[in-house]
Amino acid sequence: MNTFSKHERLSHERLIARTFSEGKSIKRFPFILIYSEAKLRVDVPAQVMMSVGKRRFKKAVDRNRIKRLMREAWRLNKSSFLEPIAKQNKQMSIILLYVGNKIVTFEETESKIKELALRFEKEIEPNDPKHEEIKQEN
């Protein structure tokens, strides 16, 4: 089901601070995805927060428009993020930051979110010992 419920939103201040300080990041302009493994209060694979800087977009209307596009792209593609996490029986906190200077279209937003999902899946998958042996032999 493609929903984005309240339980899936990251709102706990300590978790947000810890994700920013200890998390790993993936960059795909105009987005930065910061994630860290966390023990969440609810039984979901991940909680997500989306943010657009006030310094780049002075008008709240513009910030809200970008966040709305980000939420919709996340909602439609969240299974690409959550399935790898669920396979490993982990829980993660994820922060999605918008760092661009202009408002992008939904199509651009969705394509960048999909690219982030692919890179995220590659980064969190456990290292395969067979793959490591092949690397060391070469």
Report the location of each language-model feature.
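Positively charged, solvent-exposed patches that mediate nucleic-acid binding
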Residues: 1-138
